[in-house]
């Protein structure tokens, strides 16, 4: 599966229990994928999404959190549309929902950026805002020289608000205008991995980092004849990258980690350039690649939750340090 739909599919199934986070996610989706329309003097809200799972998630949250019913309209491919589009429309109570989600202020005037309660909210609200923005208009390219995670924004105010949310997550993002369209872009590979983890896309980040490592290893092999010591250290970076987050996870959990998860993590650390299928073959007893990926994902998720409870850096925080150590070593 291509990276963008893989990420959207995973985070659209992510369970979120905190009400503030669910509100922030809905607000971001409506801001980045939605529009306000006046019909007979009343506000009608529409949000157009490219995945049915995201649309159903939005429809459910609008009802459960804000108490408004909505209709889901499926638009078949046609014209410039390559795939189906899914429109969530709120007619009855649209004006009230617009105020509840911060699309308009108390006087009914449009708010151009993200609502104040999201901008000044907790870290989890910043994560939820990014999750909603990515579901609305996000994309992730394959690892490579021009790899990037991007979100198309409805205007410069929304773009700057999203950059601010990334800053609260210690992630460097830039707002830029390309041919009249505002975008927020994250280009650094480590930052992309950290942001995907924040969004809750643990399976996708494992796949992305593995593809990233394999690309670096292949590029290294093609230039081996001309390598000097500096280039060899660069290839060591790829070897360290695969096990960096797993190593941090084992450090956070210590003796609390279940043995079957620890075993999968140790395999990842000991065989950094092996594929998930190869790791499964090395396990005793052998495992499928999906089983290995699932165990590593649960290990990282368990460690990140433990780190959050303790108020210490999570698994993604060590990645840059580990890579730096790999380069020096």
Swiss-Prot record:
In which domain of life is the source organism classified? Bacteria
Q: Which gene is the coding source of this polypeptide chain?
A: whiA
Q: Which of UniProt's keywords are assigned here?
A: Cell cycle, Cell division, DNA-binding
Q: Which residues bind DNA?
A: 275-308
List the top taxonomic levels of the source.
Bacteria, Bacillati, Actinomycetota, Actinomycetes, Kitasatosporales
Family (UniProt)? Belongs to the WhiA family.
Q: Which Gene Ontology molecular function entries are recorded, alphabetically?
A: DNA binding
GO BP: cell division; regulation of sporulation
Q: Does the UniProt entry include the keyword DNA-binding?
A: yes
Which protein are we looking at? Probable cell division protein WhiA
Q: What does this protein do?
A: Involved in cell division and chromosome segregation.
Among InterPro entries, the record links this protein to: Homing_endonucl (IPR027434), Sporu_reg_WhiA_N_dom (IPR018478), Sporulation_regulator_WhiA (IPR003802), Sporulation_regulator_WhiA_C (IPR023054), WhiA_LAGLIDADG_dom (IPR039518)
């Amino acid at each position: 599966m291509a990276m963008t739909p893989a990420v959207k599919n995973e985070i659209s199934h992510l369970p979120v229990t905190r009400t503030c986070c669910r509100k922030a996610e809905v607000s971001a989706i409506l801001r980045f994928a939605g529009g306000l329309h006046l019909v007979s003097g009343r506000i009608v809200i529409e949000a157009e999404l490219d995945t049915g799972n995201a649309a159903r998630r939005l429809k459910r949250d609008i009802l459960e959190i804000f108490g408004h019913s909505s209709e889901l309209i499926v638009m078949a491919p046609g014209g410039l549309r390559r795939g189906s589009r899914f429109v969530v429309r709120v007619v009855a109570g649209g004006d009230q929902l617009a105020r509840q989600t911060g699309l308009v202020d108390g006087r009914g005037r449009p708010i151009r950026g993200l609502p104040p309660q999201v901008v000044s909210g907790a870290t989890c609200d910043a994560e939820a805002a990014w999750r909603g923005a990515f579901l609305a208009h996000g994309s992730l390219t394959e690892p490579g020289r021009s790899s990037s995670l991007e979100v198309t924004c409805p205007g410069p105010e929304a773009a700057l608000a999203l950059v601010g949310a990334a800053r609260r997550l210690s992630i460097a993002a830039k707002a830029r205008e390309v041919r009249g369209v505002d975008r927020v872009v994250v280009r650094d590979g480590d930052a992309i991995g950290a942001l995907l983890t924040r969004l809750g896309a643990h399976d996708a980040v494992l796949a992305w980092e593995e593809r990233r490592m394999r690309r670096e290893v292949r590029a290294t092999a093609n230039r081996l004849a001309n390598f000097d010591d500096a280039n060899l250290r660069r290839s060591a970076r790829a070897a360290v990258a695969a096990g960096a987050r797993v190593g941090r996870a084992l450090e956070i959990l210590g003796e609390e980690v279940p043995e079957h998860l620890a075993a999968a993590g140790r395999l990842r650390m000991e065989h950094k350039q092996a594929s998930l299928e190869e790791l499964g073959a090395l396990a005793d007893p052998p495992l499928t690649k999906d089983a290995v990926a699932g165990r590593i994902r649960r290990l990282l998720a368990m460690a990140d939750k433990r780190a959050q409870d303790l108020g210490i850096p999570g698994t993604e925080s060590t990645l840059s340090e580990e890579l730096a150590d790999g380069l020096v070593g």
